[in-house]
Each structure stands twice: as structure tokens, then as C-alpha cells.
């Protein structure tokens, strides 16, 4: 039996119709087989919310333009319904990446970590293309508030949501640091960007029993962390996986979040102190744990990658 609210069921069924319906079903099954989706509600959401309809232009190996009408080329559907993050906004002057979609398998794990159920109210910090909010709304059937500091991002997300017939998402232009108290309290607050600390406003806008889920940026690593208010104190629990989200802008941004802000000449470095110990090889996840541990204890910790040095010569 489908236990979604009627509004969510109708919206999802409407979104699923169309030539890409089989693609959506295969896409959802792929994510579930990979262990990224853990329950039927999540699989239904990914099988009914059309990711390609939220994109007008994206980069995967090269730039692609999404057709406004008519059939969508197979090459585009292959890119969109593979497990690929897709760049969709580049700074015209610098050529630097400004915005990109989340890798679907990571997004599915994040939605699972939210522990959503019908009727929950959710605040999303960082609107992206509107796809995340549409997935959340497909699961909860309740209002989702999606907030972003960039007016053009909100305008594009609004247009995509209208295009897909999603009417349960409220989009707001504003600084994520302040949250959005006007439509709170929220059962869940999701940050879709790397943050260094939890703003007090988010804690104040949580409903009883609610929590904040955010990629917590320390030492260049972004573990997914759940923050709950327990006995007047904020308790953090790592729920994984390690992520690589773009850092928040506006008041949420703090410099030195893990990488040196500018390129600098390598050396001369002071004479190192060497300690020779037999230790097991470290995986990428081990290094993430190490950098997070160090940076959580000192804001001075950063990373510098120095080329031309062979550890075997040390």
C-alpha cells in the first residue's frame, strides 16, 4: 500500500509520465542496487522526479543544451541518469565552477540520512536546480522551503519546479545563516553546502525532535554530520559519507576552510623533524578522518600539496 500523502502521490505520478519513464525506473533501481537508496519511499521519489527536466544546460565531458520540447537525445539521458555530478553554472570571467548538481548516489544517501516521513517540514539551505527539494517533497508531501543567497539560482529553480509541476516547494532568496523563521519550525534542516559551524538561527527554527544535517567542513574534509539539540546542547553525530560540497557563501562563509586561499611558491620549508614508524597504509577516508580531527582542534590547520617530493626520500 502507498502510504504517501495523496498530494505527493498525484504529483509524483504526473512527473513520471513521459518518454523518460523507463529511464527513471532504471535509474532508481540502479541507486537501490548500489545501496544508496534504502527504502521504497526513496526509490519512488527517484523513479518519479525527472532529473533531466530540472536542467537547461549542463557540462559532462562537454556542454549539453537540454531541448525545450521534443525527444531528449540518448547521450543527454545517459549523462543525466548515470551516477554523475553535473556542472551547470560557470563564472564567465574566471571560468571557475560556481554550481553543480550532487552525485545521485550521494544525494540518495543524504536523503536517507534525513530519515524523512510523510508530513515533515524541511528547510533546505542551497537551492541548486530545485531537484533536491522536489525529491524531498515527493517523500514528505509537505511544504519544503528552499533558500539560496543567489537570486539567479532561485529564479532558475523556480522555473524548473514550475516546469515539472511541483507546487509544494517554496523558494526564498536570502542568507542561509538566518534560516527562514517565517515558515518554521522545521523537522529537518538540510545544508546543501559545506559549513564550518551551525548558525544559532537554525537551532532556534528546529521543531522538537528535529535535526540539522550538513556537510561539516574542517581541514578540507566534509563529513556528513547530524546535529540534534539534547538537554540544551548541540550534539553532533557523523552519519557519513565523506562529501566534497562547495562551501557556503555569504555570512556562512569562513576563510581557511581547508585549503590555502591562494597559490604560493613551494618552499623554502624549514628543516622537517622526521619520525620513522611502521604504520599501516592510509586510505583516502583515513586521511579525511585525520585532517578533520586536526582541524577540529585548531582553526590554523590547512592543507598544502607540495609536488616534487618523494616520501621514499624522506
Enumerate the predicted regions with their spans.
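Alpha-helix boundary/capping detector
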Residues: 53, 57, 72-73, 136, ...
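Short, solvent-exposed coil/turn elements at secondary-structure transition points
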Residues: 52, 60, 175-177, 218, ...
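Class I SAM-binding transferase module
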Residues: 3, 190, 195-313
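Class I SAM-dependent transferase core
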Residues: 2-123, 132, 153, 167
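Short, charged/polar low-complexity linear motifs in solvent-exposed/disordered segments
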Residues: 62, 142, 253-255
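Conserved nucleotide-cofactor-binding alpha/beta core module
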Residues: 102-213, 217-219, 225
